[in-house]
């Protein structure tokens, strides 16, 4: 869960960020997860190809790295982000999807995952 300035409210979102020059999406995902949550991405099971964030408004693209994380949550290392990481059961996610705001891609992934 993180505070996003544009909507001016807290939304549920996956850790994310820009891919630095010379980084692969997998290296970037490991770095971003560590920076934003303190967790280590220790196993990658899939990398989902490029998609557009808002195809009608922007050429910004996304990639999704799927894997397993371990460790203890730690405060974000960024002074520009307010992030509250957490673990959720599938039942908790199904309830959150009914009552809380999500980033669009996070909402879609959580919907599918929570029903498996």
Protein language model features and the residues they cover:
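A glycine-rich, hydrophobic loop/mini-helix early in the fold
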Residues: 1-9, 13-16
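Unchanged
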Residues: 12, 16-106
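Short, amphipathic C-terminal "tail helix"
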Residues: 108-116
């Amino acid at each position: 869960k993180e505070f996003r300035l544009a909507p001016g409210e807290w939304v549920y979102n996956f850790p994310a960020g820009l891919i630095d020059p010379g980084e692969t999406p997998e290296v970037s995902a490991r770095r971003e997860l560590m920076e934003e949550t303190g967790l280590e991405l220790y196993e990658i099971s899939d990398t989902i190809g490029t998609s557009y964030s808002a195809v009608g408004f922007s050429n910004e693209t996304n990639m999704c790295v799927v894997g397993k994380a371990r460790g203890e949550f730690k405060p974000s290392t960024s002074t520009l982000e307010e992030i509250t990481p957490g673990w959720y059961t599938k039942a908790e996610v199904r309830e959150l999807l009914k009552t809380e705001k999500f980033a669009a891609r996070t909402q879609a992934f959580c919907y599918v995952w929570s029903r498996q």
